[in-house]
UniProtKB/Swiss-Prot annotation:
Source species of the chain: Saccharomyces cerevisiae (strain ATCC 204508 / S288c)
Gene from which the chain derives: RLP24
UniProt protein name: Ribosome biogenesis protein RLP24
Family named by the database record: Belongs to the eukaryotic ribosomal protein eL24 family.
Localisation per UniProt entry: Cytoplasm; Nucleus
Any Pfam family matching the protein: Ribosomal_L24e
Length: 199
C-alpha cells in the first residue's frame, strides 16, 4: 500500500482518499482534502499558512534538518530483489522511526524550555505597569471568601433546621404518647362509671 503526501500541506493521502490533479506536462499533484485543492488553485503559498507542515518547518517549529529525514527521500535507482536486503531494510525502518520520534520529542522540549520564565516575566511586567489588576484580584478574593462564608452559613442553618425538626418530631411523639395514655385512663374511668350505674 503506497501512502502519498499531500502536495500542499504534506499530510498523508491514503488510498481512495483525496484528489489528484494532473497538469498538461503530466505532473501529478495529490491533495488530502478539498481545502488543500482550493488553496492550490488560488495559488496560495503553503509557507504562509500556519496549518501546513511547510510553515511549521520554515518557522522552526518542527525538526527540519536531521539525518533520519533523509531516509524518506525517493531514489530512482532500480535495485534487484534480495530477501535479506528487504528484511534488514524493514528492521532499519522501524529503528529509524523510533530514533526520529525521540529526536522530535527532544527538539520540542528544547523549544519549550524557557516558556515558563518568559510567561512569568511578562505577567510581572503587566502587573507592574497596571497595579489596578492587583486590586481587582483582591476584590475577586474577597468575593470568593464571602461566597464561601455564605455557603458555610447556609449549611449550618440547614443543620440547625434539621436538628429542630428532629426535636419537634421527638416532642410530637411524646405528646402523642401522653394523649394515648390520657385516652386509656378516660376509657377506664368510663367503664367504672358504667359499672356503678348498672348496679
Amino acid at each position: 500500500m503506497r501512502i502519498y503526501q499531500c502536495h500542499f500541506c504534506s499530510s498523508p493521502c491514503y488510498p481512495g482518499h483525496g484528489i489528484m490533479f494532473v497538469r498538461n506536462d503530466a505532473k501529478e499533484f495529490r491533495f488530502c482534502r478539498s481545502k488543500c485543492h482550493k488553496a492550490f488553485k488560488q495559488r496560495r503559498n503553503p509557507r504562509k499558512l500556519k496549518w501546513t507542515k511547510a510553515f511549521r518547518k520554515a518557522a522552526g517549529k518542527e525538526l527540519a534538518v536531521d539525518s533520519t529525514l533523509t531516509f524518506a527521500q525517493r531514489r530512482n535507482v532500480p535495485v534487484r530483489y534480495n530477501r535479506e536486503l528487504v528484511a534488514t531494510t524493514l528492521k532499519a525502518m522501524a529503528r529509524i522511526e523510533e530514533i526520529r520520534q525521540k529526536r522530535e520529542r527532544a527538539f520540542y522540549k528544547n523549544r519549550m524550555r524557557g516558556n515558563k520564565e518568559k510567561d512569568f516575566l511578562r505577567d510581572k511586567k503587566l502587573v507592574e505597569s497596571n497595579p489596578e489588576l492587583l486590586r481587582i484580584r483582591e476584590v475577586e478574593i474577597a468575593r470568593k471568601l464571602a461566597k464561601e462564608q455564605e455557603r458555610a452559613e447556609s449549611v449550618s442553618e440547614q443543620e440547625e433546621s434539621e436538628e429542630e425538626e428532629e426535636d419537634m418530631e421527638i416532642d410530637s411523639d411524646e405528646e402523642e404518647e401522653e394523649q394515648l395514655e390520657k385516652q386509656k385512663i378516660l376509657l377506664k374511668n368510663r367503664r367504672r362509671n358504667t359499672k356503678k350505674i348498672a348496679f
